[in-house]
Amino acid sequence: MNSFKTINLLLILSFLGLAACNSSSDDTDTASETEVETEIDTGTDTDPDTDTPLTTGILHSAYYEFDSENVEVVLSGDNVIIETNGLPNHTSPYWSSDHELFVEPTVTSYEQMAPGNIDDFVGTYTLTVANSPEKASSSSATGLGAIGIAVSGSVIYNDEEGPGIALDNAVGSLDYNGAHTGPQSFHYHLEPISFSEDDSNLVGVISDGFFLYGRKCNSTGDYPTDLDESGGHTSTTQFTQDADYHYHIQNELYLNAYYILFPGDYQGTASAIN
């Protein structure tokens, strides 16, 4: 009888031991998952010992604002590779009339519109920039063609319509997002109100790696007063706890009605958008 009780007691103790092990294992698994989630940081944290930006393995969280259907963003070491199909994620009269995002022209007309449709373009644009870009020793002029990639998927142009030709005479062809087609693709010249209208929203990234925001500064909720000649300054944003350099659409009227996206020079070292 005593032998039977002893066996039962041993079985109970063994069961309790296994339960304790399983509980410990569950706690360990949960802790491991928490650590993994914590390590996948989308911010721009710094090393607490050195205040050095952690560029390797941590993608700047602003890139998560880009439309994932049109834009692919890949962190490669200290660089970011951005590839887009060049198509916007919003409506426009420049889509083919049978496209689901087509709308009738409002601020332009069929007579004024540039030739071609958005969906005529078949290809990609690729830009490689530093994940933590730095200002160059001197500024450099933008050129014709794409100078940045917008969060919508389309590309950003400067304030010229051709070599030394101001945008003035082409404004009538722009849709309500300040964009039109030609010579190869749909692109923005003016404030794109579908995703930034008199606010601090992210507009895109310029080809020197610095982000372009709307006319207002997120850190103050108002128009920044300390912008340089390129519309840039250093402050915190909705994506950073530490201040960093970035551009804004300048709150200066163009032709008494519009706001040019990026009329200034690059303040960093620009890469080609191919």
Predicted regions and their residues:
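Extracellular/lumenal glycan-associated surfaces
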Residues: 125-129, 150-154, 182-195, 240-255
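C-terminal motif of bacterial Sec signal peptides marking the signal peptidase cleavage site
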Residues: 17-20
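Bacterial N-terminal signal peptides that target proteins for export
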Residues: 1-9
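Short, low-complexity cationic-aromatic patches
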Residues: 172-184, 228-243
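Short helix-loop boundary/capping segments
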Residues: 165-177, 181-223
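Bacterial signal peptide processing site
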Residues: 22-25
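Solvent-exposed N-terminal domain segments of exported/luminal and surface proteins
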Residues: 33, 37-43, 47-165
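Long, compositionally biased interface segments
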Residues: 230-274
